[in-house]
């Protein structure tokens, strides 16, 4: 609304006004001076219309001032016509259109999309006062409607009318009707947008900024009526730019100069002219100030509504997470499946709705990013006979359950290795951990060189980055199965298992908020795990940039790679982009390669710290098939995060399989191309499990380590004597932290970091890694062999004691 469209006179009862002069003869109409060729509507108000006793505008002030069509000019307090406003500075009379379309409200049945399992569900929608509310019409929370409750509202649709008639015949007290009219959800049209579907003439959607409602009317005409009503209500809210709000009042003097000259020519006294000018200036100034204030209040209200919506979502997520945790602790897997599969009477509609995959634009390239949670909990998937459960973790330690469709000979792979007894808990802490504030740490180090600031060990977990590389191989049985499938000529199942393995490496990052130790230059880590049928070795090969290289020998396969991270700090978050290629080579000669996706860590300063992985991962090589995996980025209020969607294509580009799941739970697949719009629900019965995350330890550690991660830093009997002096298990600060000796851990960490600052000089003098070398014509590192042979001989002559103490006179030469 333009600020000049509501010009009015000052109240006769203002105590600050001077005495009224004698009445003057009426002035001629000078509307033509403002470029208007027609008579314009008058805009007047009395004292009672202008302000209430608290100094606020009346509710209907704007409409009563803007669209009064009974006179043509603005009059002053003397009854004289002062000016007529041009049409360009007034908004169109949309209230007339709104009254014609909306009246006192709109009501009726619309079908709301819930999820793939429940589909379209009827809801009773009511549009009133700029708010679209909806109610359930079935179940204990259903709404009761009648001609009395819907009095004054325009009811849309034959089915809606029949429902009112049916409820009216059954009868019901007015009080009971009001008690049942508690909305199940609300949408404020002020901050929403409405869009019609192009593919279905009965469907439309409403986007609120935080969620999308997909709705379907009975007929095409009903949709048109609803959309027109919604749009008309939206048009009722004025849209004004800051430049319009802050328009200077000095323009008023320029605009009235012509009238001033004409009035002087007509013989009007100078006192009367000045009085009119003062009245207009005062009114314009007061109105402009009020509009600016109202605009500010409007934005504050919108921000408050958005904040309340976010807090509501967070609270609902907390309740759902707590319910799931209690169910996991006290119920069997089957009961948990029933809990998450069936919609209950008290279940929130917003927990079940994730939008229509045909309309959501999560991924333009692949058409749809379907809701994994809703898919796995749908009734059609549940009844497929696959036996898969939708609980977050399997009930055993190795994650081999619920694989009834897998060949028994394949299923047994990974289970026939010798058993090795490993620890299940970290040692009990010796000391009580001190609470450390990040803010206090920043305050204590103001003005210092941050590169020389030693972060306390309270921000670390008792693992190094070298050990974290091996943690990605927790589900190495997937590679064993991939090798066996390839031997049998099933290349499709081979790449599907490799893709599941590539995703499984991210599962251990969920809930891990502490950073691993940064290895020293030349630090190594070995993992001889006969219970997994593999041997792993890694080494830090470069300090600037920090590069870690690794190599692993498995059953029928070899895996190697190097990793370097490029970080971007965004204030409240940090983005980590991996640089490097991971290579998998099977003994039959087939090679597959891929790179990791982007990882971001959020809420570094305030809020709950969490990480997310997103981007596209492509698995390609000499194989018959290639795979593309899309990790969906988590939004701030996403209720179903961590989704992964992938497709497997042959050399001709045809999609032969579709993968879906969550990187912290499980991955499933169906054969054929099911990534198109709406296709997923048609092929639920053929879904098969590829991988499921292992169950977390019974006694969770403060670091949220997995069962597998707890074993990585363990010194089993006789192992210490066989390790080189560079192994991460022998690093003192890391060992002290694991034992809960925090003071000693901090002391040792400071000592080692001071020593590590000499690593750049070592590297500049031509230092080379002991067990890895650069490939020719590439920046990648390959294992050159010899480690396990040296381990057998116990010969570590060339390995420096990088963790030992160095006297000041034995410091590295600068």
Swiss-Prot record:
Keywords from the named record: Coiled coil, Lipid transport, Lipid-binding, Transport
Skewed-composition ranges (Acidic residues): 347-366, 395-407
Pfam family for this entry, one: PH_11
Renumbered residue ranges of the record's region Disordered: 319-366, 379-411
Positions in coiled-coil regions: 300-367
PH domain span: 103-235
PROSITE patterns recorded: PH_DOMAIN
Superkingdom of the organism of origin: Eukaryota
Compositional bias segments (type: Low complexity): 379-394
Expression tissues: Expressed in roots, leaves, stems, flowers and pollen.
GO molecular function: lipid binding
Family statement: Belongs to the OSBP family.
PANTHER family linked to this entry: OXYSTEROL-BINDING PROTEIN-RELATED, OXYSTEROL-BINDING PROTEIN-RELATED PROTEIN 1A-RELATED
Its job: May be involved in the transport of sterols.
Name the record gives this protein: Oxysterol-binding protein-related protein 1C
Organism: Arabidopsis thaliana (Mouse-ear cress)
Gene transcribed to yield this protein: ORP1C
């Amino acid at each position: 609304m333009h600020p000049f469209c509501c010009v009015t006179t000052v109240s006769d009862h203002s105590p600050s006004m001077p005495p009224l002069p004698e009445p003057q003869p009426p002035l001629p109409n000078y509307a033509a001076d403002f470029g208007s060729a027609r008579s314009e509507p008058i805009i007047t108000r009395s004292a009672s219309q202008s302000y209430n006793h608290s100094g606020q505008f009346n509710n209907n002030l704007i409409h009563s001032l803007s669209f009064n069509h009974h006179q043509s000019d603005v009059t002053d307090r003397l009854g004289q016509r002062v000016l007529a406003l041009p049409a360009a500075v007034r908004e169109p009379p949309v209230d007339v259109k709104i009254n014609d379309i909306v009246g006192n409200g709109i009501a009726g049945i619309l079908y709301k999309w819930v999820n793939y399992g429940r589909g379209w569900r009827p809801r009773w929608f009511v549009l009133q006062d700029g708010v679209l509310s909806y109610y359930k019409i079935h179940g204990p929370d259903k709404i009761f409607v009648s001609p009395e409750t819907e009095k004054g509202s325009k009811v849309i649709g034959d089915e809606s009318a029949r429902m009112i008639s049916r409820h009216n015949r059954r009868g019901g007290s007015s009080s009971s009707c009001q008690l049942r009219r508690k909305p199940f959800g609300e949408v404020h049209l002020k901050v929403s947008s409405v869009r019609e579907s192009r593919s279905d003439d009965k469907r439309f959607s409403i986007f609120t900024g935080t969620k999308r409602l997909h709705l379907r009317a009975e007929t095409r005409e009903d949709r048109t009526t609803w959309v027109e009503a919604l749009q008309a209500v939206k048009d009722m809210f004025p849209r004004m730019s800051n430049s319009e709000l802050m328009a200077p009042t000095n323009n008023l003097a320029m605009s009235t100069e012509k009238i001033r000259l004409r009035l002087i020519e007509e013989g009007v006294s100078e006192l009367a002219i000045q009085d009119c000018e003062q009245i207009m200036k005062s009114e314009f100034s007061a109105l402009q100030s009020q509009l600016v204030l109202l605009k500010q209040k409007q934005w504050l209200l919108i921000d408050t509504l958005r904040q309340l919506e976010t807090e509501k979502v967070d609270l609902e997520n907390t309740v759902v997470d707590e319910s799931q945790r209690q169910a996991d602790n006290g119920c069997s897997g089957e009961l948990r499946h029933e809990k998450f599969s069936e919609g209950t009477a008290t279940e929130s509609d917003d927990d079940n709705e994730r939008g229509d995959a045909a309309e959501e634009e999560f991924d333009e390239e692949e058409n749809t990013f379907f809701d994994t949670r809703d898919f796995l909990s749908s009734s059609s998937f549940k009844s497929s006979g696959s036996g898969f459960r939708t609980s977050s973790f399997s009930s055993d330690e190795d994650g081999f359950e619920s694989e009834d469709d897998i060949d028994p000979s394949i299923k047994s792979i990974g289970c026939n290795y010798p058993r090795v007894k490993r620890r299940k808990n970290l040692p009990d802490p010796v000391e009580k951990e001190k609470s450390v504030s990040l803010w206090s740490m920043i305050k204590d180090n103001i003005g210092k060189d941050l590169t020389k600031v030693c972060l306390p060990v309270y921000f670390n977990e008792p693992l190094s980055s070298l050990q974290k590389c091996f943690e990605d191989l927790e589900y190495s049985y997937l590679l064993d199965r991939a090798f066996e499938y390839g031997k049998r000529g099933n290349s499709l199942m081979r790449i599907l298992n490799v893709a599941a393995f590539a995703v499984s490496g991210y599962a251990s990052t969920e809930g891990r908020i502490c950073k691993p130790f940064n290895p020293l230059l030349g630090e190594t880590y070995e993992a001889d795990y006969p219970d997994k049928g593999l041997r792993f070795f890694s080494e830090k090969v470069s300090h600037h940039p920090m590069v870690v290289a690794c190599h692993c020998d498995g059953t029928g396969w070899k895996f190697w790679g190097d990793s370097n991270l490029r970080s971007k700090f965004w204030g409240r978050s940090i983005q980590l982009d991996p640089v490097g290629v991971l290579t998998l080579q099977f003994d039959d000669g087939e090679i597959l390669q891929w790179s990791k996706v982007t990882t971001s860590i959020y809420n570094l300063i305030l809020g709950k710290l969490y990480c997310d992985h997103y981007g596209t991962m492509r698995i390609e090589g000499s194989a018959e098939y290639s795979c593309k995996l899309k990790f969906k980025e988590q939004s701030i209020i996403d209720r179903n995060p961590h989704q992964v969607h992938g497709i497997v294509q042959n050399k001709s580009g045809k999609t032969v399989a579709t993968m879906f799941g969550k990187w912290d739970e499980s991955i499933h697949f169906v054969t054929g191309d099911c990534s198109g719009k709406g296709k997923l629900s048609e092929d639920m019965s053929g879904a098969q499990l590829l991988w499921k995350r292992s169950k977390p330890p019974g006694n969770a550690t403060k670091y949220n380590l997995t069962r597998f991660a707890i074993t990585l830093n363990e010194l089993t009997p006789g192992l210490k004597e066989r390790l080189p002096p560079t192994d991460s298990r022998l690093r003192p600060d890391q060992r002290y932290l694991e034992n809960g000796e925090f003071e000693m851990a901090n002391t040792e960490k400071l000592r080692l970091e001071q020593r590590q600052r000499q690593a750049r000089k070592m590297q500049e003098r031509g230092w080379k890694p002991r067990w890895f070398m650069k490939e020719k014509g590439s920046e990648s590192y390959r294992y050159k062999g010899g480690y396990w042979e040296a381990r057998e001989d116990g010969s570590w002559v060339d390995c420096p004691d990088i963790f030992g103490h160095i006297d000041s006179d034995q410091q590295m030469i600068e």
